[in-house]
Amino acid sequence: MKSLAAHGLALGLPAGWEGRIQRRGTTVAAEQTNAVVHLANFALPEQRDDFGGGVTPAMRSRDVFVVLFEYGPESLGTPLFASKGVPRVTAAMFGSKRLQRPLPGQLGCQHFFTANGRPFCLYVVAGSRAYLPRIVAEVNAVLANLDVQP
C-alpha cells in the first residue's frame, strides 16, 4: 500500500491508485490556503482543478476520482459541516445531478463534514453506475485509512 502524508493528512492507497495532497499557491501574503486531496484509481494528470476539471472528462466507466477539499475555519460550526468524522459513501448517495460538471454516464456524490476540527467536502465522481458497487467499496476502504490531524 502506497502512503501519502502532508498538511496534517495521511492515508494509504491500494495498488493501482494515485493521489496527491497539496495546497494551492497564494497570490497575497496574508491569504491562507487549505489542503486539497486528489485520489483516483487511474493516472492523475498534473494539471487538475480542485473539483476535477481536467480529470473527469477522461474517466472510463470503471474509474473513480475522489476529492477531499478543506475549507477555512470560518466554516466550523455551520450547519453544512455539522456531520462529524470521516464519512462512508453508499450507492444511494450518488446521482448524475450531484456532479460539479455533468458528463454522460458519470455519477457524483458530495458530503460535507468536520473531522478533528477541520471542515471538508468529500466529492466523488464514479465513471458509471455499472461499477458503482465496486467503486463504493474501494472509496470506503481508502477513507477508512484517512488520518486527519487537528
Please place each PLM-identified region on the residue numbering:
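Short conserved aromatic/hydrophobic patches within beta-strands of well-structured domains
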Residues: 8-24, 142-148
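Short aromatic-glycine motifs in intrinsically disordered, low-complexity regions
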Residues: 1-12, 135
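Short flexible/disordered coil segments
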Residues: 130-150
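Conserved polar/disulfide-associated segments of primarily extracytoplasmic proteins
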Residues: 18-137
